[in-house]
Amino acid sequence: MFANEVIGFINDSPTPFHAVSNIKKILDDNGFVEVYEGGREEIRFGEKYYVTRNGSAIIAFVMPEGIPSSMSIVASHCDSPCFKLKPEPVICVEKNYLLLDTEKYGGLINSTWLDRPLSLAGRVFMDYGNKIVPKLVDFKDVRLVIPNLAIHMNPEINKGYQYNLQKELLPLLGMGNDRDSFDKLLKSACGAGKILGMDMFLYNSEPGTVAGIDNELILSPRLDDLECVYASVDALINSDNKDKLCMCCVFDNEEVGSKSLQGADSDFLLMTVKKIAAGLNMDEQTFSGMLSRSMVVSADNAHALHPGYTEKADTNNRPVINEGIVIKKNSSLKYTTDGFSEAFFKKICKNAGIPVQMFANRSDIAGGSTLGNISISHMSVHTVDICLLYTSPSPRDRG
């Protein structure tokens, strides 16, 4: 079942670094060849390639058998809301409790992170002589927890409570007062060498699962947006298009605005397309013509109609889980879909026998944005924002 494939990928991808590493393995197993930014590798017709940036963003593409007439691009993101460790993270409380100093990453529902098993994963940079070497770590067998206060000490909690990020949402690492315990934990995974830097995140260590009376739902961490990531990679691998340049883009840092080296608000996509064009000796007219006939599908998630909060959905544009793929529109261009890209995508879905639903926010609720309108600010291409459905950005999404 495809849902179990998605869940397996998500379980193995606790951070963007792990997600990109796993994508590389999938692509390698399916005949893709890695090329490098700034490299002079030959780009050949009919071949399959990928390029990464900073270990947390990746673009894979399948070359047509001749000069491409257009591009079909799917863009998604591999980061999710969570907590990130600060430098020098160990805090000792009353000489008995070891906490980790964290800050929130992205838009969290804070209370959903309490009283559940959490783990640590990320990327560590090691000093190996004249080289700085990155190493992925995942302490999946180490359990941390952000403990709630007993209701007897906070009897008003069920009437609404605002948690203090600096004081009440720090994970408990363990008991005692050994401030070096965290460094020892890192070194146990990294081996010899001095640790120079790190990007470490808390994640929900409970594995994803299917749910519902007919297994029609997925309960999993990081559904936003790893389900779209996996689906787009799988679609690219199984593409048999001979005329278009087919491309899958996975960006990082969407949850915090995409303004990074590896985010959608960077030149990663544009520079990759230019690298391909240069490898094919495209002139400017051919290149601009290819762009004008291309389409970007921004594949992120949207809010399904919530059975407990039906009033939070738009009057008419209120999609339901498992009733078809969703096209998102917004007059303020938080989503990039316009009439043309809507019609174009609906035609594709009709030809494939796929039902379509429309999503729009209530007029009095701003809603979120996604990466489509950001990525096309660097490369002007028709874009449609589509999505699968989920119900909340929490450590255990539903979709």
Predicted regions and their residues:
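Conserved small/polar residues in nucleotide/adenosyl-binding loops
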Residues: 390-399
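A generic, well-ordered mixed alpha/beta core segment in the N-terminal half of proteins
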Residues: 70-155
